Structures are given as C-alpha cells and as structure tokens.
Amino acid sequence: MREVEARYIGKLGFTLVARHGRIGEETTAFEAGYGWDDLDRMGFKLRLSELERGAVNVVVQPGQWELPRVDHLGFALDEDDFVATLARAEVRELRVQEHGGRRTFVSTNAGFRLELHPPRDWLDDLLASSSELQLAELHLRADDPELKASTLGELLAAPYTEDTVMVGETIVRFVPDGPQGRPQLHAELFV
C-alpha cells in the first residue's frame, strides 16, 4: 500500500490529503508532514490514504492482494442524475448505504461499488481544478468485463459497449483475465 501511495505522490504529483487510521482504540487522521517512520513509532494503523490532484481524488487502502484492487468508483452527479441513479439501484434491489448525507455507496453485485456524490461546494472546487489534471481513461482487469461494463453503464445511464463505459469525458474499460470479484487496477490515463 505504501508503494501505491508513493507512486501517486512521487511520480504522478498527487498531494496527500490525509492518512486515516487508529492509534490503539482512538480513530485519528494525519495530514501531510508526518512520515511513515513517525506514524510507525506512534503505533498508527492505517485504514486509508486520501490523495488529490486537479479534479482527481484517489483513496488507497491496505489489502490482501499483490496488485491494487478497486473497491469502488466515485462519481460527482448533478441532483437529477443522483436521484435517478439511486432509483435505478432501487429497481434492481441493490444495497444502498448512505453516510450522513456526505456520500452514498451502491453495491452493484458485480464485484465493485459506486460512491455517488450529489452536488456539494467542495466537489465543485475539486472539479474546477480539471484543467490541472483529470482522468481520461481507467482500465480495470476483470473476470467478467461484459457484466461489469453493463452494470456500470446501466446504473449511471451512460453509453456502454461490451467492455467500455463512457462516463462524461472519461472512458472506463474492463479488460479480460482479471481476478474474480473486485477488478484490478490495470492502467490509468491522466490528462
């Protein structure tokens, strides 16, 4: 996990927003300025690291896999699309978890979740930075590219083919020969 975080910060120029975790039973977060050696000495146990650059927000978490897997894809939606996407999830009887009005997760039953955000001021600020960096393509290695693409496309009402979904200006492509369940990060194209 530390190597993945280091790649985003060192090679791709992302900024560390915060590392969230625990010291003993106490939940805590550390912003940039605390190195891993400092955190290790404090007994810090990482839950997730949040990174940001331009209009891209990446959250990395420790996992049991050698290569990164994707738990969820996050989307900022306008109010109408947010409501319509939740309605489509309800029709499909998918599990929806709302977290205090800040974000909503939808389990897709296709090995990944969607994190949906209705309009928010902080999101507008993040998206306004798209001239600095935005995600043009995301390739995910998957066990069933067709299922994953159709699930994402249908839930978001986005155009899709057998392995590719066009979400706004971003292409999400599911490539074959991936692990069962959660897709594996295969490639990203930032512009």
Task: Give the ranges of each region predicted by the language model.
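Conserved beta-strand in the GNAT
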Residues: N57-P62, E115
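Extracellular structured ligand-interaction cores
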Residues: L48, A55, V70-H72, L135
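A cross-kingdom feature marking solvent-exposed beta-strand/loop segments within repeated
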Residues: F30-W36, M42-K45, E66-D71, F75, ...
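Core segments of cupin and vicinal oxygen chelate
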Residues: M1-G54, H99-R102, L140-T170
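Vicinal oxygen chelate
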Residues: L86-E146, S150-V191
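Short, ordered coil/turn segments that flank beta-strands lining enzyme active or ligand-binding pockets
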Residues: G54-V56, N109
